[in-house]
């Protein structure tokens, strides 16, 4: 977008813009600083420990809701994908840094599940569905409707359940293996039984 387009869209005088900013990049930089720390909004107000199953599901649902309701976030993501500059690189890095403590908590607690990679796929899907919603339905799901939104919300709940069921199964197998070992059952038999 050119400065002249921005000034027209914002309905401000060029002098007002140039008194505050030297160029469009400076404006974008300032704009992003005000709007891009939305990840904390996603985790605020969660009633469950953020490193629990219900906390995880709540984070995914809140992310979907925030992107559904706040088009500014979508525009920032769209810009980040479309252009590579200092501002877009920095905001991508900052978003990653804000998420890092949460990622590390899940990674530590759920070692047998690559929850980080699974989460990356889910979050990427949430981003894409929301970026795409103004174009057309995706997989016959229309995020512009309440029905479509509810379907995605339910799917996020199901995905969260599946991820944690896998971890619970791994934990159970580990407990059973330990008890079998305590009762003198060989490693080979334990492996055959639990694979």
Task: For each feature predicted by the language model, list its residue ranges.
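Amphipathic alpha-helical interaction segments
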Residues: 5, 58, 76, 117-124
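Short secondary-structure transition hinges
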Residues: 41, 65-104, 143-146
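Helix-turn-helix
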Residues: 1-26, 30
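Hydrophobic alpha-helical connector segments
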Residues: 30, 43-73, 112, 119
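Phosphate/oxyanion-binding loops and surfaces in catalytic or ligand/nucleic-acid-binding neighborhoods
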Residues: 34, 38, 66, 70, ...
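Long, positively charged, glycine-interspersed low-complexity recognition regions
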Residues: 183-195
């Amino acid at each position: 977008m050119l400065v002249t387009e921005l000034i027209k869209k914002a309905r401000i005088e060029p002098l007002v813009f140039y008194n505050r900013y030297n160029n469009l990049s400076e404006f974008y930089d300032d704009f992003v600083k005000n709007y891009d720390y939305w990840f904390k909004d996603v985790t605020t107000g969660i009633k469950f420990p953020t490193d629990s199953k219900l906390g995880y599901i709540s984070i995914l649902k809140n992310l979907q809701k925030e992107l559904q309701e706040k088009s500014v976030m979508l525009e920032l993501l769209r810009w980040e994908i479309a252009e590579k500059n200092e501002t877009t690189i920095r905001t991508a890095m900052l978003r990653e840094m804000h998420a890092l403590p949460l990622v590390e908590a899940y990674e530590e607690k759920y070692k047998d599940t690559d929850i980080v990679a699974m989460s990356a796929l889910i979050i990427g899907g949430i981003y894409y569905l929301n970026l795409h919603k103004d174009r057309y339905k995706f997989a016959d799901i229309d995020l512009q409707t309440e029905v479509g939104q509810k379907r995605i919300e339910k799917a996020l709940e199901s995905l969260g359940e599946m991820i944690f069921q896998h971890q619970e199964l791994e934990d159970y197998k580990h407990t059973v293996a330990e008890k079998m070992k305590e009762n003198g059952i060989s490693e080979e038999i334990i492996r055959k039984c639990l694979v």
